Amino acid sequence: LRRQRQMCIRDRVKKNYDYVLIDCMPSLGMITINALAAADSVIIPTQPHYLSAKGLELLLRSVSMVKRQINPKLRIDGILMTMVIPRTNISKEITATVKSAYGKKIKVFDTEIPHSIRAVEATAEGKSIFAYDKSGKVAAAYEQLGKEVAEIGEKQRNQNRADRIR
């Protein structure tokens, strides 16, 4: 009954919106599992830090489990590098490692979200980066990410149309 109610809500929301973003805490609790169960696709953010990169494998296993057991239509749209400090060797090395380890199977977005004190301040103020610093580098990166995500969405819609015609 709960799953039917969840799917009914999801279907009603899908009629009114092109995209619905569900931002979950970086844990694998029930909220995250329920979000994956309701989702069409997932974008996996990770930081260019050793522990974040290690946690990526665990999250990918969880996504695979949800796909197998609950939501067979779930797909991974990509891995998003966040809080990147491009001038540091560790950011460069871990980003390169993520791309080489996963890039053949899973898209690693071209857009990287840079680390910025302005983003930290926006979060502390309870504002979006666009409301807090719309002309800053983080807002520009998120705008670019939006274009990449829209392109993926358009390709998926075209694929769905082609599948229905067959």
Model regions and ranges:
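C-terminal lobe/tail of nucleotide-utilizing enzymes
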Residues: 70-166
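Short, conserved glycine- and acidic-residue-centered signature motifs
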Residues: 1, 52-55, 138
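Conserved catalytic-core segment of NTP-binding enzymes
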Residues: 14-114
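Single conserved hydrophobic/aromatic residue that forms the stacking wall/gate
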Residues: 1-9
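A periodicity- and composition-biased signal for non-globular, repetitive helical segments
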Residues: 8-9, 53, 154
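Hydrophobic residues within well-ordered alpha-helices
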Residues: 6, 59, 142-145
